[in-house]
């Protein structure tokens, strides 16, 4: 089975939902450049509905958490400011341990917003969820089996194409996603702005611009996380139909077999896709029967927390 070409999926997603809507030049928008424009080209867009004065509702808990209402996964490529976002929300403190059975460090903390407590799990920085490294495997397994209430994907506003590859893969696993469009300060220094509203429309999930190092946009970020976690914002990701009829049938049949062998396993369709794509680790986990135990272990870790 041929490997899924994620860059092809990405290019398709970058085409606007209204494919006949003309750009300034009169042609249909088809590329990443439709999201990025110079500061002079960007139209002013005041937003009366944007959350303001929310800082007073945010309480940084660090690791002082005996229980929580929601689990939030923080995912992203390396060097996108993910740890800066984590530290800004949790109060510059991390609870560091190891992932179960792994040597990779795990950091988690928490914050309280509007009387609700959020546990934030900082996943290893990774470019993909296709599980070719231990970091990718950890991030993938947590998103597949940890059942986070919300997944925040931190992306670099200056390198959207590279970063949105991971975001697209996350959207294949879960609907409850918020895109944190970070490093907006650097984008401005380069004379660039990102049309986050259009990006949100085309992805089907909220997009929040931030500059975490300067605490810009974090109030809106926690507000949006809260809205998604409580169901006040319903995410409807625009997934690309990139599977052929034959592949769809194979995925459907294999998904049914997986669900029969591992009752209650979340995201069985993604597992089927990885098996068809030749994922050796996933295949071994299915053949040995370890997949069910892995799912239980990851879900338990999400609820209990990292070891001290």
Where are the regions a protein language model picked out?
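Conserved C-terminal guanine-recognition region of P-loop GTPase G domains, centered on the G4
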Residues: 114, 140-206
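Residue-level signature of catalytic and energy-coupling elements of molecular machines
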Residues: 73, 85-86, 104, 120-122, ...
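Conserved nucleotide-binding/hydrolysis micro-motifs of P-loop NTPases
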Residues: 101, 125-126, 157-161, 183-188, ...
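Helical mechanochemical/support elements of P-loop NTPase systems and associated helical scaffolds
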Residues: 100-104, 119, 131, 135-138, ...
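Extended helical scaffolds that flank P-loop GTPase cores
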Residues: 5, 50, 234-308
